[in-house]
Structures are given as C-alpha cells and as structure tokens.
C-alpha cells in the first residue's frame, strides 16, 4: 500500500480520554512499521447553553452551561496490512468518536 494515507479524526468531550486514545494509536502504528504524523490538535468547539434558573419568572436570573468538543487528527503514511489489522483490533474508550478516512 505504498503512497497511501490513512487519516484518523478523533472527537471527545474529555481531553484526557482523547489524548490517551491518540497515544495508543500512535504507539500501535509505530510498532507495525508505518510513519505517523500527529496527533495534531484541532480547534476545540465550545457550545454554550443559556437556561433560565426559575421555572416561571425572574428572567434576569440565568445559568450558563457549556460543552467542549476536543478534536485530534492523526495521519498514517505508507500503512502496511499489518498496520490496518492492528488498527482494527485496537480497543478505545466508548467516549471517543473515531472517524477513519
């Protein structure tokens, strides 16, 4: 598979889980002999939700909640069949969304 490239995008709400998953992927790929670029941190997406604290009135009293989505990008250059097999067998937490292109 010379000249090929695999791009892995990771998304998670917890930055520690996404960093541990990225580290595990990089270790697995380097062990199989392919080259790795990354993990590259992409901009964190921040969603803020404003909610009125009281159920009926007092509109001036509000509460803000935020959700941060952390993203990482990993490129695997010149993957071998052994690399692809190792990536399929890797065990990652359920809180990390993995998109492979």
Swiss-Prot record:
Gene3D superfamilies reported for this sequence: Ribosomal protein S10 domain
InterPro entries: Ribosomal_uS10, Ribosomal_uS10_CS, Ribosomal_uS10_dom, Ribosomal_uS10_dom_sf
GO molecular function, one term: tRNA binding
One example of a Gene Ontology biological process annotation: translation
Superkingdom, taxonomy of origin: Bacteria
Pfam families in alphabetical order: Ribosomal_S10 (PF00338)
A GO cellular-component term linked to this record: ribosome
Keywords on record: Ribonucleoprotein, Ribosomal protein
SUPFAM superfamilies: Ribosomal protein S10
Described purpose of this protein according to its UniProt entry: Involved in the binding of tRNA to the ribosomes.
Protein family membership: Belongs to the universal ribosomal protein uS10 family.
NCBIfam families the record matches: PRK00596.1, rpsJ_bact
Subunit structure: Part of the 30S ribosomal subunit.
Protein known as: Small ribosomal subunit protein uS10
Native source organism of the sequence: Nocardia farcinica (strain IFM 10152)
Gene (UniProt): rpsJ
């Amino acid at each position: 598979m010379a000249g090929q490239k695999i791009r892995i995008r990771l998304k998670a709400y917890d930055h520690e889980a996404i960093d541990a998953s990225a580290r595990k992927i990089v270790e697995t790929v380097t062990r199989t002999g392919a080259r790795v670029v990354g993990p590259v941190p992409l901009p964190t997406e921040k969603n803020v939700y404003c909610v009125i604290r009281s159920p009926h009135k007092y509109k001036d009293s509000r509460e803000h909640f935020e959700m941060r989505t952390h993203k990482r990008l990993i490129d695997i250059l010149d993957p071998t069949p052994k690399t692809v097999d190792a990536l399929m067998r890797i065990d990652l937490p359920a809180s990390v969304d993995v998109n492979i292109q």
